[in-house]
Amino acid sequence: MKRFILILQFLTRIPIKLNVGFDDEFYKSIVYFPLVGFVIGILSYLIGWISMLLFEPFIASIIITLAGVLITGGLHIDGLGDTFDAIYSYRDKEKMLEIMKDSRLGTNSLLAIMFVLLLKVGFVYDIISNNSLWVIIFMPMIARLGVMLLTYKTVTPREKGMGNLFIGKLTTSMLITAIIYTLLIVALITKFIFLLPNIVLIKVLGSIIVVFVFIILFKKHIYKKIDGVTGDILGCGIELSELVYLIYIYLLIFMFF
């Protein structure tokens, strides 16, 4: 529980007034990444539910998307912008890493943030218009499960950085544990809270495979650029994985079936 509280305080702006001290093995809290996502998902769902009572679906979709940014303090959206500024500057590795540390927003950063947020709003709008707000609960959870792969048997090209707390530290047992409890939470909520049929559960679980495949391809692409992973890339991976999840859900559940 101590490590879960620590990682929740680290990755979100949820006001938790608990002093649980320092943990010399803080890296082990990475196993709770999906659980942090689950908390974010529940909060986003509740905010979405209230928003839909007060506003039209389009406004509610904007509020839901904004909620995800505010709950995390913009931590991951900042990583998205920094990553796109650096990786698509088409400079050498050292220059890319330097650009990634620069707090100023470039054109690539602004475009990436704008398009990702707009696409999220669009897909969330379609999803909630189909009376499927429950889908939002699993988006942050599955995205953070996927991004754990970016910390599995990886290296970082930087000597310092927040991402160094986790990159290369994930063990096989930690990954398996996270996968198992994620599957259980998705199954329990889908079947026993929302009483959805088995076919819907199978489709939602399929999003985990899709996100994993995306992250593997994303990691290969990043390695070609800077020979490793940084904290910004972890944040970028979360934002893009959430978008991939929404696209998958929209195409598989609402468009083709």
Swiss-Prot record:
InterPro entries: CobS. GO terms for biological process: cobalamin biosynthetic process. GO terms for molecular function: adenosylcobinamide-GDP ribazoletransferase activity; cobalamin 5'-phosphate synthase activity. It comes from the Bacteria. Its cofactor is Mg(2+). Its main location: membrane. Its EC number is 2.7.8.26. It catalyses: alpha-ribazole + adenosylcob(III)inamide-GDP = adenosylcob(III)alamin + GMP + H(+); alpha-ribazole 5'-phosphate + adenosylcob(III)inamide-GDP = adenosylcob(III)alamin 5'-phosphate + GMP + H(+). The keyword Signal does not apply. Joins adenosylcobinamide-GDP and alpha-ribazole to generate adenosylcobalamin (Ado-cobalamin). Also synthesizes adenosylcobalamin 5'-phosphate from adenosylcobinamide-GDP and alpha-ribazole 5'-phosphate. PANTHER family: ADENOSYLCOBINAMIDE-GDP RIBAZOLETRANSFERASE (PTHR34148:SF1). Belongs to the CobS family. This is Adenosylcobinamide-GDP ribazoletransferase. It comes from Clostridioides difficile (strain 630). The lineage of its organism: Bacteria, Bacillati, Bacillota, Clostridia, Peptostreptococcales.
